């Protein structure tokens, strides 16, 4: 949890995304559930909303617990973003293992559950940044593959604010099991088809640019089969030195049948280097990545249609909401080429197709 000055100017959020299937229509949708805390040391018996005219007028920073839940859009079917706010006084927390609850919303390492019901009247208040609708979830969670970011997420670098936003990919391949009820329609979530993802971010502000890319649905060109214990995760970050921002970096891990290929500055002995490019067209976002270290090289290309993405809203600890949209979706597709260095040459390990990828981008 947030401590010290971060508790007065900081955030922590736990993200989950996964697929569910409606048993009556066989429709597949990609859902998301996020638990977040903003400036907990400033909390009172009521949530302080940074976009509310009263709190803006009095110069109060936001402080609340928030549940954000919804579904990403599909062609011909719009997405939904629901937000509900709770006071810090409603928070119950236990450690070892970590457990968090406020009202009927529960988070633990192996289960999440809760509900949101937003009326049309409530949704008309722009300060709440929410659509109207209802969402109920009750899910078992099994985090099968984690991303290891090395020393950069330890207590010292967190205390000196070496990054604007820290990341722990605690479940870059996660299996969900349970049910979701969206506006009265039930969806079943099964481990083998959930293609789930779970992570945690915390810090003093959100990354600019905001860049994220991940998939736990990898298919081998060698065998034509879906890979087990395999996943890709990429997260952008903004390092600082003596409080001055440095060149933007990415943290990348490709787990291939249980073997981790890591490309980030949290593992300095691997001599990692990463390049990336993001292109926005009228219809799509397109990503290209190339990363290498002492023992391997990976090339990644992926894209997602804007019809399957939506702008998500976030309020920063200082009470600001960016005018630049954060586009996010859950159906990115693309290719991966993975090579191993053998002497002075490269040996192809495998070519992979990926589907059902989580993708997010907000330019600076």
Model-predicted segments: where are they?
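Structured soluble/peripheral alpha/beta segments that form catalytic or ligand/cofactor-binding pockets
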Residues: 1-364
């Amino acid at each position: 949890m947030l401590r010290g000055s971060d508790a007065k100017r900081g955030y922590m959020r736990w993200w989950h995304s996964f697929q569910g299937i409606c048993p009556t229509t066989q429709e597949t949708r990609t859902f998301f559930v996020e638990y977040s805390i903003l400036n907990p040391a400033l909390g009172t018996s009521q949530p302080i909303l940074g976009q509310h005219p009263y709190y803006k007028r009095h110069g109060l920073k936001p402080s609340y617990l928030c549940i954000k839940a919804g579904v990403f859009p599909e062609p011909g079917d719009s997405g939904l973003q629901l937000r509900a706010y709770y006071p810090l006084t409603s928070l119950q927390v236990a450690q070892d293992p970590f457990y968090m609850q406020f009202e009927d919303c529960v988070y633990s390492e192996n289960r999440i559950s809760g509900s949101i019901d937003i009326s049309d009247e409530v949704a008309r208040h722009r300060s709440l940044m929410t659509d109207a609708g209802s969402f109920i979830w009750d899910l078992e969670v099994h985090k099968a593959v984690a991303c290891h970011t090395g020393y950069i997420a330890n207590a010292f670098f967190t205390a000196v604010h070496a990054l604007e936003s820290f990341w722990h990919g605690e479940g870059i391949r996660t299996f969900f099991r349970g049910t979701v009820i969206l506006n009265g329609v039930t969806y079943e979530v099964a481990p083998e088809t959930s293609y789930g993802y779970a992570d945690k971010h915390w810090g003093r502000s959100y990354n600019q640019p905001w860049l994220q890319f991940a998939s736990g649905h990898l298919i081998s060109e060698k065998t034509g089969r879906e890979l087990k214990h395999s996943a890709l995760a990429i997260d952008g970050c903004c390092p600082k030195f003596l409080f001055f921002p440095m060149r933007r970096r990415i943290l990348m891990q490709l787990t291939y049948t249980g073997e981790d290929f890591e490309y980030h500055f949290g593992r300095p002995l691997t001599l990692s280097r990463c390049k990336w490019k993001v292109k926005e067209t009228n219809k799509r976002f397109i990503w290209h990545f190339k990363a290498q270290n002492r023992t391997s090289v990976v090339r990644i290309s992926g894209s997602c249609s804007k019809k399957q993405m939506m702008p998500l809203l976030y309020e920063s600890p200082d009470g600001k909401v960016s005018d630049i949209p954060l586009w996010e979706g859950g159906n990115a597709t693309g290719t991966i080429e993975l090579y191993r260095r053998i002497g002075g040459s490269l040996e192809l390990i495998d070519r992979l197709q990926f589907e059902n990828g989580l993708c997010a981008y907000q330019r600076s």
